[in-house]
């Protein structure tokens, strides 16, 4: 049995890997898979990691890139909340006190909060700060699913809850960041057939239809 150890953030493991792992195991039944979910990044100098998924921009210390998933960042909320709020402008999102923003601690150094999102969209005015904060992005996403407010959504990361209707992408500008979810392997190691198979499987995914989100802003 071939062993494969994969490291990813808690949110990526929870929302992207776990819902889809059955398909990889069906494709590669001979691979014994171990998933390490952690938000504190550590290069694999002192432990055995075959592959990692990290959000940001290269270089990543001790690692090299073998694949990437592009992202769009857009406000998301529960469908019932989207229906109640109706059509919104960016100014509405910034100023209306009945639109509760949800924020979280960063699982990655370049992760955006609301202040960063507004800034990168070119918003120069003030905005209502988030009233609900979580130490985990997974908790922030679940709070949005439960109707507690509006969270920032990374569309590849949240592809499953967006597809199954637990979350709705709001009709607001989508941000196209330079950062990606990168598939990484240790610098001094050649990719094994299992690593190559996992990288292909992860990168293939479901392509994100760019027309699904309006007014994309590249930064």
Residue ranges of each PLM-predicted region?
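C-terminal effector-binding regulatory domain of bacterial HTH transcription factors
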Residues: 30, 155-168, 173-219
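Central regulatory/effector-binding core of bacterial HTH transcription factors
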Residues: 2-61, 215-219
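Acidic, Gly/Pro-rich loop/turn segments at junctions of secondary structure
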Residues: 34-110, 115-133
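Alpha-helix/helix-capping structural signal
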Residues: 10-11, 79-80, 138, 156-157
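Short, well-ordered beta-strand segments
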Residues: 5-7, 52, 76, 102, ...
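Short, surface-exposed acidic/glycine-rich loop or hinge patches that mediate macromolecular interfaces
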Residues: 11, 108, 188-189
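Hydrophobic hinge/microswitch elements
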Residues: 123-170, 176-177, 191
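Tryptophan-centric aromatic hotspots in well-structured domains and transmembrane helices
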Residues: 13-16, 60, 111-120, 134, ...
């Amino acid at each position: 049995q071939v062993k494969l150890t994969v490291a990813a953030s808690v949110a990526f493991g929870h929302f992207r890997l776990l819902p889809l792992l059955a398909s990889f195991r069906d494709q590669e039944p001979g691979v014994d898979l171990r998933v390490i979910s952690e938000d504190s990044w550590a290069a694999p100098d002192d432990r055995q990691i075959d592959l990692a998924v990290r959000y940001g921009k290269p270089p990543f210390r001790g690692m090299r890139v073998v694949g990437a998933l592009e992202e769009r960042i857009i406000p998301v909320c529960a469908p019932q909340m989207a229906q109640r709020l109706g059509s919104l402008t960016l100014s509405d999102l910034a100023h209306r006190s009945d639109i509760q923003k949800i924020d979280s601690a960063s699982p990655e150094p370049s992760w955006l909060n609301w202040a960063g999102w507004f800034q990168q969209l070119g918003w120069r005015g003030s905005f209502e700060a988030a009233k609900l904060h979580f130490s985990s992005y997974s908790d922030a996403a679940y709070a949005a699913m439960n109707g507690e407010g509006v969270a920032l959504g990374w569309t590849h990361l949240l592809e499953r809850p967006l597809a199954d209707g637990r979350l709705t992408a709001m009709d607001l500008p989508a941000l196209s960041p330079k950062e990606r979810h990168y598939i990484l392997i240790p610098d001094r190691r050649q990719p094994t057939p299992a690593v190559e198979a996992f990288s292909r499987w992860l990168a293939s995914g479901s392509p994100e239809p760019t027309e699904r989100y309006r007014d994309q802003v590249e930064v």
